[in-house]
Amino acid sequence: QICLSLVKLLFYLAHSPLGSIALLDFQPRQFVMVDGNLKVTDMDDASTEELSCKEDNDCTLDFPTKSFPLQCSAVGKCKGINEKKNLFNAYRYFFTYLLPHSAPPALQPFLSDILNATGDLRYGINETLKAFEKVLHLYKSGLYLQKRPLLLKDYISLKGFRTVEGEDYKCWPSYSHLGCLLSVHSAEEAAAICNSQSQCQSFIITQQRTWTGRPLASFQSSLTDLIPDANAVVYIKRSASSGKRL
């Protein structure tokens, strides 16, 4: 969410009515989330000035670990320097830390492509936004899910109940520090996740959803007391429920 919102912001800055705008002090502290959207807290360090040049050799974009040769345009300005400066800063301050951990394994290759392409500045902001929107579409639609045997048949479902909340085993990237709370496309995907985790014996899906509209599933290692909840469904492994009273 943070990376996509940042890319949308940089897309606007690249195509603003004032011209391409560079953020000169590009640090995480300069941004804040407001209603799910990333905002710049201080525009005093923004500039529409693009480096003047006479030839391509005048247009090197330097960073501490990398340098990028750019073209000198016919009007004597380094072509796209503000856009590329913003994009590489987004790569080094945000993408490298957030993208490797922010999607299911099947989507990781798409995020790796974005990471590599922005790190080498092979993508401009237009291509970067398009790539992010493709990943978001795959994520929200569930099209990334690989065809696999139906696993939900191995679970008993109890509608209108949930288990008592409490601390349980942890997983990454969890929405809760108390246990394993992940977003899923469906109960079938949740069953696949539960099967892949040796501690998991059951999971609960409620109507709580993430910013993408995906439901949250809470994975648990033991069967605890059930309490009524009209908006929840408990799924318990048949192997875990055998011999236990439900």
Name what the model sees in each region:
Residues L10-D42:
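Catalytic-loop of the protein kinase fold
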Residues L10-L18, N86, L98-A103, L136-L143, ...:
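Eukaryotic basic, amphipathic alpha-helical target segments in cytosolic regions
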Residues I21, V34-G119, E127, A131:
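C-lobe/activation-segment region of protein kinase-like
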Residues A22-F31, P105-L115, T128-E133, L145-L150, ...:
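Short amphipathic alpha-helical segments embedded in low-complexity Lys/Glu-rich regions
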Residues P28-Q30, D113, D120, G124, ...:
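C-terminal, well-structured subdomains that either form a transmembrane helix-short loop-helix hairpin
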Residues S102-Y123, W211-I227:
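C-terminal/domain-terminus segments
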Residues F132-Y139, L143-L246:
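Extracellular disulfide-rich cysteine clusters
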